[in-house]
Amino acid sequence: MKNLTLENIARVCGGTYYGPADKLQEEVMSVITDSRKAEEGCLFVPIVGERVDAHKFIPQVMEAGALATLSERVLDNADFPYIAVESSLQAVKDIAEFYLKQLQIPVVGIT
């Protein structure tokens, strides 16, 4: 994965960073939406679905070594870095668009 820092991600998705200032320059190693795939250095994107609100998995993901998480709400008493966003789904779209532009490769759509 090309280098994306928490600071870049917060800026790109219009989010507000909460957490230690020294973590802002930490690089995200992967982006996940499935809490079962949490790994060291990942960014968790909790999606609110019809049946499950993935925000409830944030504690387990952080315990598994995630670097940070996005959240559609302010997390009181959080002792880990997170980026508050209006919509996790829109934020991950914004991050993906920014990431693709960094790669400077042609993108082809097949219909």
Q: Which ranges hold each PLM region?
A:
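N-terminal leader/targeting and accessory segments in enzymes
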Residues: 1-98
